Amino acid sequence: MANGHINARTLHELYQQLGLSTDSLEKESGFTVHYLEETFKDLPFRSEPFRPNYFSFLFIKNAFGHYTIDDQRFEVTSNTVYFTNPGNYRIFEWEKLEHTCLITFGEGFLKEYVHHDVYSDFSFLLSEVVSPRILTQHQFDQVEELCGLLYKEYKGNALYKNKIIGALVIALLLKIKEYFFQDYNPISEGNRSSQIVKKFKLSLEHHFRDLISGKTNTQLRVQDYADMQALHVNYLSSVISSKTGKTISSWIADKNITEAKIMLQDEALSIKEIASRLGFLETPHFSNYFKKHMSISPAGYRKQYFNSLS
């Protein structure tokens, strides 16, 4: 999927780029709900590859098609729910559409109208590749009722419209959590199969190799690591902290200190040269940084290390 070339911050933006009607979609709220059969009237339909920067829930009562996410292709059939989150390349294909509800929302909407720390209660929103899940008839009936209420509020003009929608989204997320994600453990996924975590760790490792070899002398920021994966910086930060138990800043700091300690054990390297190799413009800044994390200055660490060898 590496050749996909559409990047979309919202569903409205995606539909515009795909040449589809956006009449039923609001542009600014960060939330949408609509029935796909109203948009896709000429079937079969296959989208171009795209990378969305929003969450999607697809509730399929009567339809058939396929959904490709990165290198995995899933069959989508009736009475299923399909969830995707920001970041992965994907393609959707529809052969039959009679009753299918798509709900999308951005992280900003979640944090403003659901909860500012939404991932603490709904950590499954950070799961990266989730195959379609089959609902029992009772489960689907409950979800369908919530979809109907969300659609009604979305099309209405209530004074507290987005707050009402936010409350209904909480109910929907709780149902999905109850049905499928009671045992979801982000740390376990982070250790085992998180592609976002793996890519971040590889990027971190490669960057420090470039620093130490002299290929670059500029430290990357958290924003730079997010840009490498075409993710919003807040989303990447949430994924890394939830799935590793450490913030991105902590990962960077730990790597800085590890590499600094290794170089301080080489008497041929001056502290000024070590600071420069790690991207610090001034040696005092590096010394203060090292002492903050190690409670000892670089010179003190070096002396302590060589004393321990004698």
Predicted regions located by residue number:
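Terminal helix-turn-helix DNA-binding modules in bacterial transcription factors
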Residues: 242-283, 303-310
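Short hydrophobic/aromatic patch on the recognition helix
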Residues: 79, 236, 285-286, 290
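Short, Lys/Arg-enriched, Trp-marked, Pro/Gly-tolerant hinge/linker segments that flank
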Residues: 158-163, 178-224, 242-247
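Short beta-strand His + acidic residue motifs that chelate non-heme Fe in jelly-roll/DSBH
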Residues: 67-68, 84, 90-95
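Generic protein-terminus/edge-of-domain signal
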Residues: 1-65, 72-74
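A hydrophobic/aromatic-rich effector-binding and dimerization subdomain
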Residues: 2-4, 95-155, 175
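…primarily DNA-binding HTH/wHTH and HhH modules…
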Residues: 287-310
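Short acidic-glycine-tyrosine-enriched beta hairpin
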Residues: 71-83
